[in-house]
């Protein structure tokens, strides 16, 4: 990540905090944990178990896995649930065991796998909790890892919302043998990887260690601040004076920007951060990095989702009449 300074600015440490230095109670309500989901429970059940074991009001999972599917299941804790839709932006990766119902030549198998790379059409399965309309999904990568008789082990990197069971069914039909998905494991879910996933029992043990012995070290290793789950987004760093206005949903203006990440375009989602590294909001850039650096006034990011609660930073802006299109007033930082 390369940040370009638009205007040097200092932050006041009387407000906000470094995300990695939050007290443990705040972390549990503004954090996340990546669970290694076991075979059996639903994703909703796993999220509910995490909520109950950590004594939270709410928790939500990012990306449903069928009961028999294992692997990386990110769980948003407390107020972090508002970040879940952002986790669906990057691709997901799976390792799948596919079983053919008849013999097939290696050359035919390889050709079918090539055919199913790129844009594909899918209709959600009957059990899906969404409307069964035809949709386009992108298969970025698909690689055969091993073939043993009629069993094919493969890895695929695909767009969020791709049904792997349906992908296997469709490939089996195209091959002329028919096929079914025997096993599936998610290895990457957006910005989260299976090697950082933790077992439910380990999370419970760490929580008990903190509650009974006051030892929060192990719990901090497992629970990450919400900002950890937004690291895949390009960043715009704002001055303290702009934070609370953005927390109220106001469009980000050029005068509130301190630093901009190189390479931002208008076709992506960007993260608005404080000078301390706290996530404030996400939004749609109205111009690219180069133009943001040049402009002295005007709107630069349209806010689409506010993350930080209002009131953490001081309010040093004035409400405008809804019909007033002029730039909001704020003090220089």
From Swiss-Prot:
Record-linked Pfam families: DKCLD, PUA, TruB_C_2, TruB_N
InterPro entries: Dyskerin-like, PsdUridine_synth_cat_dom_sf, PsdUridine_synth_N, PUA, PUA-like_sf, PUA_sf, tRNA_PsdUridine_synth_B_fam, TruB_arch
Organism superkingdom: Archaea
Keywords attached to this entry: Isomerase, tRNA processing
EC annotation from Swiss-Prot or TrEMBL: 5.4.99.25
Catalytic activity: uridine(55) in tRNA = pseudouridine(55) in tRNA
Gene Ontology biological-process annotations: box H/ACA sno(s)RNA 3'-end processing; mRNA pseudouridine synthesis; rRNA pseudouridine synthesis; snRNA pseudouridine synthesis; tRNA pseudouridine synthesis
Span of domain PUA: 233-308
Gene3D superfamilies assigned: Pseudouridine synthase, PUA domain
A GO term for molecular function: tRNA pseudouridine(55) synthase activity
Residue positions of the active site: 66
SUPFAM superfamilies recorded: Pseudouridine synthase, PUA domain-like
Family in the record: Belongs to the pseudouridine synthase TruB family. Type 2 subfamily.
Primary role: Could be responsible for synthesis of pseudouridine from uracil-55 in the psi GC loop of transfer RNAs.
HAMAP family assigned to the protein according to its UniProt record, in alphabetical order: TruB_arch
The name this protein goes by in its record: Probable tRNA pseudouridine synthase B
Organism (species): Methanococcus maripaludis (strain C6 / ATCC BAA-1332)
Gene that encodes the chain: truB
